[in-house]
Amino acid sequence: MSTLPIRTVFFISDGTGITAETLGHSLLAQFPEARIRQVRAPFIDDLDKAIDCANQIREAARNDGVRPIVFSTLVSPETVEALHKADALFLDLFDRFIGPLETELGQRSTHTVGRFHGIADSLDYKNRIEAINFAMAHDDGVSSDGELAEADVILVGVSRSGKTPTSLYLAMQFGVKAANYPLIPEDFERNKLPGELHNYRGKLFGLTIAPERLSQIRQERRPNSRYASLDNCKYEIDAAQKLMRRENIRWLDSTTKSIEEISATILQSVRLNRPGY
């Protein structure tokens, strides 16, 4: 059992905190033995909120007996200064990079609060909403031939192999219109793709998964059923992989991959150059 003290880690932002939390998690993942208690502090966009947050940091330091770690993407010098007065390891993610960028680009930063994630009126936001609606409307094979023409990518694989969450993540994070289609026993018996997919081979990407993991997931949904049995899962996975090889479909084993890794692989494979939001 670890004897390391518990450290409180704050993710502080004047916006949603997504950037601070994402980068913070990436860095902390390099220290698997660290004992961490996480505190999210979004929308710290004025001095009063910053002072309250600084007091929380001081309280955490007293309770833990060690100073907290702060990942910050605050822009306002006033709020940054207030937080610097607290006893913490303060990792200012914007300050670390804004200066070199100003020098390289030959211009001053706007230092505008909420600049990146404040996109409610932008085209990017509209595209994301449309992509989310598309993913929900074209889940689990609910698509007509004409509608599939609008898809940026069509995910295929056996039931519960991760198609739906991946489709939604691609939509929410990248504005990608992703449909998904289940491969079912009838497809394996015919040893061919569903007819409606034939015209869209270039958009197809397959997901597979270890049979043991698939059986575990299916048992949660339909315990003690043939659908969830390990033998059936082995059969379906083997048949799906053979079908994808025969049809020359690119595919990925999702068993040990995060949804972020799966999505990045799909974007690269189908050559969708989309910025993340």
Curated annotation (Swiss-Prot):
Top-level class of the enzyme under EC nomenclature: transferase
Signal peptide: none
Residues involved in ADP binding: 157-164
Keywords attached to this entry: Kinase, Nucleotide-binding, Serine/threonine-protein kinase, Transferase
Enzyme Commission numbers on file: 2.7.11.33, 2.7.4.28
Record has Nucleotide-binding as a keyword: yes
Top-level division of the source organism's lineage: Bacteria
GO molecular-function terms, A-Z: ADP binding; ATP binding; phosphotransferase activity, phosphate group as acceptor; protein serine/threonine kinase activity
Recorded catalytic activity of this chain's protein: [pyruvate, water dikinase] + ADP = [pyruvate, water dikinase]-phosphate + AMP + H(+); [pyruvate, water dikinase]-phosphate + phosphate + H(+) = [pyruvate, water dikinase] + diphosphate
NCBIfam families assigned: PRK05339.1
Protein family: Belongs to the pyruvate, phosphate/water dikinase regulatory protein family. PSRP subfamily.
Function text: Bifunctional serine/threonine kinase and phosphorylase involved in the regulation of the phosphoenolpyruvate synthase (PEPS) by catalyzing its phosphorylation/dephosphorylation.
Protein name per its UniProtKB record: Putative phosphoenolpyruvate synthase regulatory protein
Provenance organism: Azoarcus sp. (strain BH72)
